[in-house]
Amino acid sequence: MGDVIPLKVNFDLINVDDEPFELELLRDPYSLKSWLRYIKTHEGSTLEKRVLLFERACSELPGSYKIWKSYLELRVAHVEHLNPYFHAEAFASVNDCFERSLILLHKMPVIWKLYLQFLMKQPNVTKIRCTFNSALRALPVTQHDDIWDMFTKYAEDIGGLFCIHVYRRYIQVEPRAIENYIEILCKLGLWNEAARQYEDILNRPVFLSAKRKSNYQIWLEFSELVVQHPDHTQNIDVEKVFRAGIKRFSDQAGKLWTYLAQYYIRIGDYEKARSTFYEGMNNIMTVRNFTIIFDAFVEFEEQWLSARVEASSGNANDELSIDFHMAWLEKILDKRPLYINDVLLRQNINNVDEWLRRVKFLEDDSEKVVQVYTDAIKNVNPKLAHGSLGKLFSEFARFYENFDDLEQSRIIFEKATHVPYKTVNELAQVWIDWAEMELRHQNFDAARKLIGDAVHAPRKSHISFFDESLSPQVRLHKSSKIWMYYLDLEESVGTIETTRKLYDRVFELKIATPQVVVNYANLLEENAYFEDSFKIYERGVALFSYPVAFELWNLYLTKFVKRYQGTHMERTRDLFEQALEGCPPEFSKSIYLLYADFEEKFGKAKRSISILEKAADKVKTADRLAIYNVLLVKVALNYGVLATRTVYEKAIESLSDSEVKDMCLRFAEMETKLGEIDRARLIYIHGSQYCDPRVETDYWKAWQEFEIRYGNPEETVKEMLRIKRSVQTKFSTDSLHIAKRAAKIESAAAPMDPMEQLEMEKSEGPKALAGFVLSKSNPQETSKITGEEN
């Protein structure tokens, strides 16, 4: 295999064994199957014999793809391990075979690819280039992809101008390959051509990156290229391209503005760079982008100053210029918050808070402050304002007030009262601020007149405060905010008569709040108009429903009782009955207790107890225990302890199960003190049905101590234990009680560490078996009881 086989065929290689194949081919020399069988039979023969057969077959069947492909693979395999430089003739012979095959098989891409792969191993760039061109001309466009892939890879391996020319042709066929082309241009240092190709990409309306890069990334790559190699991109209108990108990516333009400025820095145009930085900061729309530009600007100025200092010759002019520039840079740094404020206002010009913040930044310059206020009032849309637009006007007026220019302040307030604010309360605040200004300068009458004019309206107004279709100015007289201020103002500087008229006007407009009712009543009370004060409370409870009415009744009744005490008994009782008539159970407890206390102090004890008994039926279930506690005390004080039995009995009937236990314990304790042991035992028995022995241990402990002291083991103690087992069985089978018990145990017992639990069990000692009760005080007596029970 190491020797080169000449193409000249020796027909003496045909031997007797080949006679059947030869005879068959004589009969039909164009039989493909016959030739293939013949060739296959001699796969193990010498190369000369196989070449002879392939050449004869190709001569008879020059258009057979199968024969040519096998033949070419044979010839390529024979020389592929050889050095093409030292065996050029052998490679040329194989090349000739490929050329002959392509005469009729020029539409077969596999043959072309096999040929091109073979050629690319040979040092003949021109022939390879021509063969690629021939393949592209011969094959249809749909089959060009594989050829171009081979062509471009080969071109990249060769490099230089050859690669450039190949890619220039390729990107006309496949525009998305332009990114690879740009990378090659950059590797070769052809920066101007790379920039021109970037410009071509950026000018396209739509570009889909083969490398999955966003358009913004491509802009940044172009920017970096231009900034790093400004001297090689002179044929491109760099500023125009950058500004197109800034316009296109307005939300991410910070880096593009910075790159444009750096481009001017690289070409030495420092003033143009500064103006670019300024323009960027004045047009950017986000704080993030502003920060990028500002930081780059400051870095540039610091580097420029450092360079000036190093290059300074030490003369006075240079020192003065450097000092001036340093002061200018410090001023720029100090103005950073103001620049950020500019950005935020560009984002939303209706942001009132930012306008006010801008005033604070410029508070040392009166002219600029006035200009800011003027611009804000001119540009902010009242219906779109973010924040309180009224505050803007008030602060503007306050600015002139600080300079004692009250006339100008009044002009601003006058204009502010005609602005169509989003809410009525905002307009009300403007009027209040105006009045406050007048008060600060002792113009009390002017302040009263202002607010009076603001709330002036027809005697009978049917306008709804919540009607958004009407302007705030039309609805202002229904604003409780401005009326509350007006009332406070009138109380401070007016008379009782004028103040009463205003309060009455508030009631006429039907905008009275609970606070207005209380304030009006207190005002009248302070001026000794007690009956009028009580009338206001009556108007208040008629206006408002519960729970507001409950608070008003509480105040009304308390003040009425305090005023008249026991002198108007029937009237006071009527008021209490009126208060309780429509009072929901959840609010009636306080009124009943107040009523009972009144009767006890100024009326009859019997009537007080009767009220408490009625309260026990009327209040909500959760409040009944408190009522019964008071009732028990009152009955015991007035009628003796024996009289409390009926109260206890009624309480046990009406209280909830959880509250009955405590009531039974108290009842039994009372009977025990009276010596009524049997009655006490019956009470314990009655209460036991509500007490789970595993949960309500206090109840059963109290009963056990009672039986130990007053009972006998043979009967009462045994009966108690029987009842206890019965009750426990009942609770064990009641799913509702099981759930309650589990919840109670979970809430009462925190999770315990296993080691702590083990230590606790050891410290507690042995536990009693189920059904037995361990005694803490007298083990012998307990064992006696349990033994007798068994």
From Swiss-Prot:
Its main location: nucleus. It is found in: Nucleus. HAT repeats lie at residues 12-44, 45-77, 89-121, 123-157, 159-190, 193-228, 233-266, 268-303, 331-364, 368-402, 404-440, 457-492, 494-526, 528-562, 567-601, 639-673, 675-709. Keywords: mRNA processing, mRNA splicing, Nucleus, Repeat, Spliceosome. Signal peptide: none annotated. One of its GO terms (biological process) is mRNA splicing, via spliceosome. It comes from the Eukaryota. InterPro entries: HAT, HAT_Syf1-like_N, HAT_Syf1_central, HAT_Syf1_CNRKL1_C, Syf1-like, TPR-like_helical_dom_sf. Residues 769-790 are annotated as: Disordered. Residues 775-790 have a biased composition (Polar residues). GO terms for cellular component: cytosol; nucleus; post-mRNA release spliceosomal complex; Prp19 complex; spliceosomal complex; U2-type catalytic step 2 spliceosome; U2-type prespliceosome. Involved in pre-mRNA splicing and cell cycle progression. Belongs to the 40S cdc5-associated complex (or cwf complex), a spliceosome sub-complex reminiscent of a late-stage spliceosome composed of the U2, U5 and U6 snRNAs and at least brr2, cdc5, cwf2/prp3, cwf3/syf1, cwf4/syf3, cwf5/ecm2, spp42/cwf6, cwf7/spf27, cwf8, cwf9, cwf10, cwf11, cwf12, prp45/cwf13, cwf14, cwf15, cwf16, cwf17, cwf18, cwf19, cwf20, cwf21, cwf22, cwf23, cwf24, cwf25, cwf26, cyp7/cwf27, cwf28, cwf29/ist3, lea1, msl1, prp5/cwf1, prp10, prp12/sap130, prp17, prp22, sap61, sap62, sap114, sap145, slu7, smb1, smd1, smd3, smf1, smg1 and syf2. Belongs to the crooked-neck family. This is Pre-mRNA-splicing factor cwf3. The lineage of its organism: Eukaryota, Fungi, Dikarya, Ascomycota, Taphrinomycotina. The gene is cwf3.
